[in-house]
Curated annotation (Swiss-Prot):
Protein's recorded name: 3-isopropylmalate dehydratase small subunit 2
Catalytic activity: (2R,3S)-3-isopropylmalate = (2S)-2-isopropylmalate
GO molecular function: 3-isopropylmalate dehydratase activity
Function per UniProt: Catalyzes the isomerization between 2-isopropylmalate and 3-isopropylmalate, via the formation of 2-isopropylmaleate.
Originating species: Bordetella pertussis (strain Tohama I / ATCC BAA-589 / NCTC 13251)
Protein origin, superkingdom: Bacteria
Pfam families from the UniProt entry: Aconitase_C
Assigned keywords, A-Z: Amino-acid biosynthesis, Branched-chain amino acid biosynthesis, Leucine biosynthesis, Lyase
Length: 216
């Protein structure tokens, strides 16, 4: 998992509440459990004018020019500004997969659905909670100033606006540690590899029959 320490990125906005996981990545794209290939279908029903299905050549599909991610000013955005209850609906880890594979490193919103919030941390996506008034001001600024960027300093737990103001945010220490060090669940487990091997060797010495093999 890619570590997250500090990130400055162009901000794209999604000005709607209760964005559910089916809107983030529609159900027909959940047939694969590989963590690859979901970025082109992020917000599929909003980005394209036709109905998307797995295997379609997205480069030939008609784009919805009104959708923010299709507008030139938001190309290359890596910070998503959203409204409250982002990521609600069914549990699907494909949602943060699609967001990160598109290129987003962080989301800023007043609130999130719990499961999406937890899944985001496990996949290197930083979900930042700011107050509704702060988020509303950021929305106004993004709309008013093309090329609007934010600097996110995870170590200091602040979002820094272009005018220099700092917006603090909370994060659980363990989640912060994992993001700073690029550790997902597998990475955390591998840090204990020596202890795991020592335990397996001791168990085998005490209970050798547990590793017995059937006679051919």
């Amino acid at each position: 998992m890619q570590a997250f320490t500090q990130h400055e990125g162009l901000v794209a906005l999604l000005d709607r509440e209760n964005v559910d996981t089916d809107l983030i990545i529609p159900k027909q794209f959940l047939k694969s459990i590989k963590r690859a290939g979901f970025g082109p279908n992020l917000f599929d029903e909003l980005r394209y004018l036709d109905h998307g299905e797995p295997g379609m050549d997205n480069s030939k599909r008609p784009l919805n020019s009104d959708f923010v991610l299709n507008q030139p000013r938001y190309q290359g955005a890596s910070v998503l500004l959203a409204r409250k209850n982002f990521g609600c609906g069914s549990s699907r880890e494909h949602a943060p997969w699609a967001l990160t594979q598109y290129g987003f490193r962080a989301i800023i919103a007043p609130s999130y659905a719990d499961i999406f919030f937890n899944n985001s941390f496990k996949n290197g996506l930083l979900p930042i909670v700011l107050g509704e008034l702060e988020v509303a001001r950021l929305f106004d600024e993004v709309k008013a100033f093309p090329g609007f960027k934010l600097n996110i300093d995870l170590e200091r737990q602040v979002v820094i606006a272009p005018d220099g103001r700092e917006l603090g945010f909370d994060i659980e220490p363990f989640r912060k540690y994992c993001l700073l060090n690029g550790l997902d669940d597998i990475g955390l487990t591998l840090r204990q590899a020596d202890k795991i091997r020592a335990f397996e060797a001791e168990r085998l010495a005490r209970h050798p029959w547990l590793e017995s093999r059937p006679v051919a």
